[in-house]
Structures are given as structure tokens and as C-alpha cells.
Amino acid sequence: MAGNKPFNKQQAEPRERDPQVAGLKVPPHSIEAEQSVLGGLMLDNERWDDVAERVVADDFYTRPHRHIFTEMARLQESGSPIDLITLAESLERQGQLDSVGGFAYLAELSKNTPSAANISAYADIVRERAVVREMISVANEIAEAGFDPQGRTSEDLLDLAESRVFKIAESRANKDEGPKNIADVLDATVARIEQLFQQPHDGVTGVNTGYDDLNKKTAGLQPSDLIIVAARPSMGKTTFAMNLVENAAMLQDKPVLIFSLEMPSEQIMMRSLASLSRVDQTKIRTGQLDDEDWARISGTMGILLEKRNIYIDDSSGLTPTEVRSRARRIAREHGGIGLIMIDYLQLMRVPALSDNRTLEIAEISRSLKALAKELNVPVVALSQLNRSLEQRADKRPVNSDLRESGSIEQDADLIMFIYRDEVYHENSDLKGIAEIIIGKQRNGPIGTVRLTFNGQWSRFDNYAGPQYDDE
């Protein structure tokens, strides 16, 4: 009979394809993988956790499969078994049994899945296809926005594109994340301790700050930490942050990245030349240099050009997604980053949250912490302080003085305030001395470190004066 003839693919295809039909593309999916996941769960309820940490209902391509998985989740949460009978009855109660194909389709799912042995691999396939479909959806959304910008600039559209794509990555937890057995954590911890034991580091396990007393307090700037440097105007917060960058660049080979939202790159470079050459920055700004000054600057330039590991981005009004994409590019090109510095946090923007400053700052702070973790690099972000501290007798900052402080204080691993008494008291006994007040340190002590401030060189140096109370 004709029905028994083998299927011929060429015979099934029309000789001339309809151009409109040919232009239609079916989103990536795997019906077989979805069926195997659902069937496997009916065979072995114990595999639910393996599947649930990989996929959610929306990852399934067909609506019936989404409904079935949702109902399975409801049964699991109520402590009921998931099998052909309980699932069919539950779907019946929700009025969805017929829409998913009836009892017959559920029976087919169960019958056609021989075992749940490979269910994790099938779930990974479902998840992978779902991510690609999300990317296609976002790409279409970006294209629509390009055709109909509604008054948005190209920069706004780029920010939209980056944020939508990054949101896919952020919403998809890595399958390597999640709870780990203490044995695995201990193995990794002991391996790290052994590594530190075998490598001489003088107590500095992170990025060397260049300041002995600060290193003793912090053990260096730790990878994945968000570090906030805050001060009132004229205290030298940009100078201090730049000195951290310079010291990191000189003491290691990894690139350091500066996002200067307030100051152009030429001014940043002039400060660095003054600091590293120990030449009066006023002379550099005015060009009134003698032969000795030129010799010092030439020597510094030679070192900087030899290392070539400082990158400066002086774009204004950057968004977290722009900072993230540019930092990622540098990290990708150089196999990592040693340090990221942002001057300063409140000059960043999140267009979608511009109507609510508190939420905007919270998103910026959260994003910078996420960047530090993603690239495993210390991120130093400068921050403003509230004017209210000017009304106090003791004007040394505390954590609550951070402007829009709630989210910043919560996200930060290390908070350092700069205080110079001579700014407020002309006849202070502490002229030329800066206090670095550690207001918060998630994994270390708080306290105060003294540094010598050489303003003419735009530089903080190690303190060599009498002993002081560092509590």
C-alpha cells in the first residue's frame, strides 16, 4: 500500500517554495528534550531539584509543556507525588488537561521516556535553547527601537541594547552556582591557604596599596571587593585614588582602568606625572619647568611607556552597562585587570531610573559590586559626602555621611574616608597629615591610618611621624 512506502523528504518538499513561508524562521527549541524532561520527572520525582535549578516554566517552548511543568512545580511544593494520575488530576482541576493534549499525551510522555538518567543533560538543552530565544527576542526589540527611536539618541539605544543583553546573563544563574558541600568549600579554602603560604607576600594578599600601614589593616585591596573612597571637597579623594592606581600599576603588570567622569584625561595624566616625578603640579600645569623637572618627568614617562598598563576613559555620564562592557573588553584583551577606579560614583547614570535618585544610586552601587565579582578585581569608587557633617564639631566622616548612603554602605566591602584636619583648622598640629578612616571592612578591622599629604606633588606618602592610636 502507498501508506507503507518509505518517507522521501524530497517528495515532501514543494518544487518551488513560497518566499513568505521560506522567510519564516522557527525559534530554536527541542521538543524531544522538553518531552524527556517532563517524562523523566514523572518517572523519578527525586530528580526535581536537578531540573528546577536549571530551567523554569518559561524555558519550555510549547505552551502545553509550560503548563505541565508549572503543574509539576505546584505538586512538588505541596508535597504530592508527580506521576501520570496525580498530574492528570491536577491539570483537570485547573481546567487545563485538554489544552495540554489530555491524558493520552501525558501517558505518551511517560511511556516514551525509558529512564531519568540523562534528565540533567536534557534540562541543559532546554535551557540553552531558551537563552537563545531570549537573545532573538531582545534583538528584535532592539531592532524595533532602532526603527522607532521615539526621540532617543543613539547612545540611549546602545544603553538599551547593552542592558537588555546583560539582563539575560544576570537572570540566568550559572549551574556551577548554588549550595556547595562543606567538603568542596574546605578543599578550595585549604588550596588558597597553601597558595598564600607558598608565595611570599609580606601580608599583602590583594593589590598592594603602596602604603605600609594601610596594607597592614587591609592586606591589600582584595579581588571582587567594592571599595568606596569618600571625602568632603579639597580633602584629596581623587589624589588618593589616583595614588592607589599608580601604586597598583607600578607594582604589578596587570592593566589598571580609570573611569574619570569628572576630569579630562590630560588633567589626570598631569596629576600622575606630578605624583610619580615629585614635581610641583603647578609647574606642570603652567609649563614652567626647569631642567631637573624635565629630567624627572622624562624618567617617569619612560617607565609609564614601558609598562603601558594604565588605561583612562574620561567619558562623562557613563551607565553601569557601559562601564561593564568597557571593563570586560580590557579584561578580555589582557587576560584580566588589576584594579578599576571610578571617579566618581554619583556622576554615573541609569536613564531608566533617573526619576528616582535613591533607586538610581542603588542600581549603580549594585552593578559595581557585581562587576567586581564578575571580573574578580577590586573596584575603587569615589563617593561624595553629605554637607551635614559640616555642622558637627568633629568633622571626621562616618558611614552615615555617605550621600545616598543606604545602598552604598550595604554593597561596599571596604569604606575609606579621607580627613585632613588642616582643611578646617588653619593652625592644626596635624598639618600635612591625612587620616584614612576605615569605616567598614567586611573581612578585617576598622580604624585609622595616617599618611603624609604632599599636595604640591598631588601625592600621599607613608607616614613617618610619631606613633599614633590607630583604633
Swiss-Prot record:
Induction info reads: Slightly induced by hydroxyurea.
Leading EC class: isomerase
- Source domain of life is Bacteria
Q: What is known of its domains?
A: Loader protein DnaC alters the inter-domain and inter-subunit interactions of DnaB, inducing an open ring conformation that allows ssDNA to access the interior of the DnaB(6)DnaC(6) ring.
Q: Disordered: where is this region?
A: 1-27
Q: Which residues form the SF4 helicase domain?
A: 200-467
Describe cofactor binding as the record notes it.
Answer: Hexameric enzyme depends on Mg(2+); in its absence, DnaB is trimeric.
What cofactor does its activity depend on? Answer: Mg(2+)
Q: Give the family per the record.
A: Belongs to the helicase family. DnaB subfamily.
Reactions this protein catalyses: Couples ATP hydrolysis with the unwinding of duplex DNA at the replication fork by translocating in the 5'-3' direction. This creates two antiparallel DNA single strands (ssDNA). The leading ssDNA polymer is the template for DNA polymerase III holoenzyme which synthesizes a continuous strand; ATP + H2O = ADP + phosphate + H(+)
Q: What is this protein called?
A: Replicative DNA helicase DnaB
Record entry for activity regulation: 5'-3' DNA helicase activity is stimulated 2-fold by single-stranded binding protein (SSB) and 6-fold by SSB and DnaG primase.
Species of provenance: Escherichia coli (strain K12)
Q: What is its EC number?
A: 5.6.2.3
Q: What functional role does this protein have?
A: The main replicative DNA helicase, it participates in initiation and elongation during chromosome replication. Travels ahead of the DNA replisome, separating dsDNA into templates for DNA synthesis. A processive ATP-dependent 5'-3' DNA helicase that acts on preformed replication forks (have single-stranded (ss)DNA tails). ATP is the best nucleotide for helicase activity; GTP, CTP, dCTP and dATP are poor substitutes. Participates with DNA primase DnaG in primer RNA (pRNA) synthesis during initiation of DNA replication. Has DNA-dependent ATPase activity.
Give, from the UniProt record, the effect of changing A130V.
In dnaB8, dnaB43, dnaB454; temperature sensitive, no DNA replication at 42 degrees Celsius in vivo, in vitro decreased helicase activity at 30, at 42 degrees Celius almost no helicase, no synthesis of primer RNA (pRNA), low ATPase activity, still binds ssDNA
Tell me which InterPro entries the record gives.
AAA+_ATPase (IPR003593), DNA_heli_DnaB-like_N_sf (IPR036185), DNA_helicase_DnaB (IPR007692), DNA_helicase_DnaB-like_C (IPR007694), DNA_helicase_DnaB-like_N (IPR007693), DNA_helicase_N/primase_C (IPR016136), P-loop_NTPase (IPR027417)
GO process terms (BP): DNA replication; DNA replication initiation; DNA replication, synthesis of primer; replication fork processing; response to ionizing radiation
